[in-house]
């Protein structure tokens, strides 16, 4: 009988996903690591093995039916799952009408369809066990409407709403659910954004990936609120976003991306 808990992390090959994998290995978890980049996954798995964790790479493109099927099969084959981290995601550049439609479709599949299907597969194991945890990495963007990020904000809002509803359903089953809503975080994702024409957000707005992940895990382990917003600056920003008129929020988000 396995004695170590098992976690599955999507988007594990870089950024917040890699940090989650390392943090969970340090907490005694074995891991299923899901991403498209098999080479990076194998390097990460070897690194985690030095800590005593068993880490299995699952090479899958979650924007495709084949990739989702591979991931669902990995969950079913494991026969147990203690924690799911829905982390895989990406953003597009430019206004909705100017962004390639194929990329927007892929974002919808990754942020919505993949999250739903992988969570469904995980719950088939968690519900009978009456325990488990599900973290979906949403964003503070889920609380705003930002020009140049329309579908990103919309799909992140889906993830947050999905998690809030799921928490109500799963709480009585002993399954904890969290929507992690970080702001700007020092990762490859935001480095690509900050090097682009949109410019760089002020330094005080940036978080470390380690702080984001530790905030998430501490809150989940403590049985805290469903919504996790790391950083005092973002707690204030979300409070304002929930109470200010849409046109004011539009001005705020435009100023954030203004060039220095």
What label would you give each PLM region?
Residues 95-108:
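Substrate-binding pocket helix/loop in short-chain dehydrogenase/reductase
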Residues 139:
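Residue(s) in the substrate-gating loop at a strand-loop-helix junction
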Residues 119, 155:
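Active-site helix of classical SDR
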Residues 87-92:
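Conserved NAD(P)H cofactor-binding loop of Rossmann-fold oxidoreductase domains
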Residues 27-44:
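Conserved glycine-rich Rossmann-like NAD(P)H-binding loop of the short-chain dehydrogenase/reductase
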Residues 13-14:
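Conserved glycine-rich cofactor-binding loop
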Residues 167-232:
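SDR active-site lid
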